[in-house]
């Protein structure tokens, strides 16, 4: 097989002729050239003005659109949305489960998502395996386990006494005072967490509470935030759906509100004052079946009645939005469906794209390296045969993502007439 750019071939690739949406929030630019060299963006500008170098590989993308590699700031590779998920865990050997999770990583990358935050359920070894080139997937920030109070969102013990998390390994850190919350944070940091996740409210899938119920107290959340700051300023994400818990989380100093479905005006004020991010995870409202119990489905239905109105108000007032899907609750590899859902809140397609690129990079503290197509940044890039400004929903269908580049390597090549890229570890 001939050398393939991004594997063992030339290290300078020129993508030319495409329309570029660079992720900064600026409008599209036609007939561009994007040069990738040694894993980073070089020249980005008009195709007719680009410098040429002997031996470079030129890929003609006329009629396509280039965008930065996307982020999904809220996934769970632990699980999938198949109704038989629990049954498979019981039947499969643990090694099979590991390979199933690796497949979810690949599906996510092939969909155009090159960076994710996994907010609970897998250990740091998956992150490390991707970074070492042992398996294909997006780069990852991981939370490992959720900090919850006894009987809260991440206490999954059923009335029978059985804890379903025993099937998948530790999923929770239960803490019932500030000292326990601090200790739980230290355990997570010891185990390799990049981000700490706290449960500030109840939730849809938790058996013993409602989304409006409060979770950890302000004092408990503040203890987590303080401890995380002592360790390289680790961010804290808050599962928060009800209005009171959202405000508790913000007063405790969290970096992001996950879901935020019932946020009220005071909560929006707090978000604006503190510069916190909102990750709406709208994709969960568009799911049917899966592993929702009848009780969880009813909670979801009730939340949906108010969530779109409240989240739209947050968008209208300028709260910083980052894209996240809760993939795992929903399907993996369909992450970019969330872009169309964000436009339902009043965002323009360009704003939705920025939520999945630059804004998400800012949330993860990676905006100096990722999130936009700019000279000097890490070369994460996708090409689509759709026009996302006319049909942004097309990006949610992986067949419309015809090329994916991560760290300057082509990891998906669906362009007609080109040999498929060998998808294997470095």
Where are these regions (language model features)?
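Histidine-rich, glycine-flanked metal-binding segment
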Residues: 2-14, 20, 24-67
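C-terminal cap of metal-dependent C-N hydrolases
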Residues: 38, 362, 375-422
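Metal-associated gating/positioning segment near the N- to mid-region
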Residues: 64-132, 150-156, 219
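Histidine/acidic-residue-rich catalytic or RNA/ligand-binding cores of hydrolases
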Residues: 81-85, 128, 154, 207, ...
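Active-site mouth loops of central-metabolism enzymes
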Residues: 86-99, 165-183, 235
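His/Asp/Glu-enriched, well-ordered alpha-helical/loop segment
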Residues: 230, 304-387
């Amino acid at each position: 097989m001939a050398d393939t750019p991004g594997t063992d071939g030339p290290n300078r690739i020129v993508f030319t002729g495409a329309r570029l949406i660079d992720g900064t929030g600026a409008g599209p630019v036609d007939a561009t050239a994007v040069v990738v060299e040694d894993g980073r963006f070089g020249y980005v500008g008009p195709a007719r003005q680009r410098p040429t170098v002997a031996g470079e590989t030129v890929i003609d993308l006329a009629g396509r659109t280039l965008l930065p590699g996307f982020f999904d700031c809220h996934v769970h590779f632990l699980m999938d949305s198949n109704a038989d998920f629990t049954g498979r865990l019981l039947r499969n050997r643990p090694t099979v489960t590991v390979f199933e999770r690796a497949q979810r990583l690949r599906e996510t990358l092939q969909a155009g998502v090159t960076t994710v935050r996994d907010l609970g359920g897998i250990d740091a070894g998956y992150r490390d395996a991707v970074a070492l080139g042992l398996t294909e997937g997006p780069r990852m920030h991981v939370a490992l386990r959720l900090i919850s109070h006894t009987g809260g969102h991440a206490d999954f013990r059923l009335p029978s006494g059985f804890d379903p998390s025993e099937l998948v390994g530790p999923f929770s850190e239960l803490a019932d005072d500030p000292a326990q919350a601090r200790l739980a944070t230290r355990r997570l940091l010891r185990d390799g967490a990049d981000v700490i996740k706290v449960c500030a409210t109840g939730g849809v899938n938790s058996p013993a509470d409602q989304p409006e119920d409060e979770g950890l107290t302000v004092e408990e959340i503040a203890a987590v935030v303080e401890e995380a700051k002592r360790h390289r300023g680790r961010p804290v994400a808050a599962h928060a759906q009800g209005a009171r818990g959202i405000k508790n989380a913000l007063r405790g100093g969290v970096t992001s509100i996950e879901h935020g479905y019932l946020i009220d005006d005071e909560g929006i004020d707090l978000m604006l004052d503190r510069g916190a991010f909102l990750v709406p995870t709208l994709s969960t409202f568009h799911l049917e079946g899966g592993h929702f119990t009848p009780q969880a489905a009813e909670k979801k239905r009730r939340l949906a009645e108010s969530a779109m109105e409240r989240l739209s108000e947050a968008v209208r007032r300028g709260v910083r939005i980052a894209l996240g899907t809760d993939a795992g609750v929903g399907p993996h590899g369909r992450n970019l469906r969330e872009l169309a859902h964000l436009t339902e809140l009043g965002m323009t397609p360009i704003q939705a794209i920025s939520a999945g690129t630059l804004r998400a990079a800012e949330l993860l503290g990676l905006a100096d390296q990722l999130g936009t197509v700019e000279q000097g940044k890490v070369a994460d890039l996708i090409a689509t045969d759709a026009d996302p400004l006319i049909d942004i929903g097309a990006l949610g269908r992986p067949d419309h993502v015809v090329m994916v580049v991560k760290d300057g390597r082509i990891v998906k090549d669906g362009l007609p007439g080109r040999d498929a890229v060998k998808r294997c570890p470095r």
